[in-house]
Amino acid sequence: SVGVIYKYFTDKNTFFLQCLDHSLELLSNVLKEAVSEAKDLRGCIRKIVAALISNSKIHSNYNAMYNEIMSGSCRKYAKDLVDRIEGRSAEVYRTLIEQAQKEGMITTETDAGILAFFFDNLLMMMQFSYSCDYYKDRMRLFCGDLADDEDIMADSLIRFMEAALQMKPME
């Protein structure tokens, strides 16, 4: 019953923010693991995409909540929470891309922040494609039966990102 929620939380806003905090902690753990275990940007991308697909299916309710915030129906939260929600991934992605540019792993001279933004947009779309009904149907419309093969979808996204970032081929 909905009334049980108020036994543990003072109001629905407190409940919502607690759910958000938990989902952000999950995101932080995925990013920390990807950065600490991968040797370079290519490895990070592979780890992030694999974790994203897996976690999107396991934690689809958090992604639906995130989608709800972004859709405009939770305007009172959106402005205040954008730094809190996006700040973690934006900094990690920007730093990884800057490092890869300095090391010559990617050849594009496009600003790292802009690349991080587009990179995150692709990840976000994939995340929703595995957790929100509209985006699941959208993925199926574009990809047909291939949408059912997580390995093909992950590998295709990774190759697309590597091409977009103008990553040098693996040696």
Go through the PLM ranges and name each one.
Residues 1-14, 18:
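Helix-turn-helix
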Residues 2-7, 27, 41, 59-66, ...:
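Gram-positive cell-envelope targeting signals
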Residues 54, 87-103, 121-171:
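C-terminal peripheral helix-coil segments that are non-catalytic and often amphipathic
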